[in-house]
């Protein structure tokens, strides 16, 4: 999945990849065009919740981060695992924690579910990019090796099956309903917003 943003003379491409059978999302940002070096600011917004509820601003969320190789890790609530947020090249991380309130989910409202959520920012990454340069952001429940993130993104992208025919689309989609979790293999009997 890719989105290209264009503001003035700056063109930034964002590619999002969920890693198959791993609790990790990789996002590659490429500065496709710019008149000069550009400062990219990444401000992750965190929920730390299950799929059936939405986050609301509260005083018990832990806003502290711990430095890890290439980024930080955080755990908003004791019952959740750590979230590792890392980059493929050195970046500055800082800023005060704050709540971004009343995020509006149109599809959830259409389905008749709660549709407004408060998301916590524990800080932001800042990194300078030159024209043609890329950086990969990883969010994972496991610590990654930042030196491998760019290579891993390219490898995982190449592993994606071609979907040029109906049969290829069906095979690819069917594989998404096979879940390997905690040493068990399950077949998802519905959409992912239902409990597995």
Residue ranges and their predicted role:
Residues 1-196:
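Acidic, mature catalytic/reactive cores of soluble proteins
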């Amino acid at each position: 999945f890719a989105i290209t943003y264009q503001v003035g003379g700056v063109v930034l491409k964002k590619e999002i990849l969920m890693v198959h059978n791993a609790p990790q999302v990789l996002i590659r940002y490429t500065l496709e065009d710019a008149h000069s070096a550009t400062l990219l600011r990444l401000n992750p917004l965190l929920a730390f919740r299950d799929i059936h509820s939405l986050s609301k601003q509260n005083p018990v969320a832990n806003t502290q981060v711990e430095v890890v190789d290439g980024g930080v890790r955080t755990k908003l609530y004791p019952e959740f695992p750590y979230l590792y947020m890392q980059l493929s090249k050195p970046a500055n991380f800082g800023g005060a924690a704050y709540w971004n309130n009343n995020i509006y989910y149109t599809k959830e409202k259409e389905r008749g579910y709660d549709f407004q959520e408060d998301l916590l920012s524990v800080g932001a990454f800042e990194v300078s990019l030159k024209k043609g340069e890329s950086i990969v952001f990883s969010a994972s429940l496991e610590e990654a090796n930042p030196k491998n993130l760019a290579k891993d993104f390219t490898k995982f992208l190449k592993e994606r099956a071609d979907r040029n025919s109906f049969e290829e689309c069906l095979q690819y989609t069917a594989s998404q309903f096979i879940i390997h979790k905690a040493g068990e293999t399950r077949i998802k009997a519905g959409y992912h917003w239902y409990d597995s």
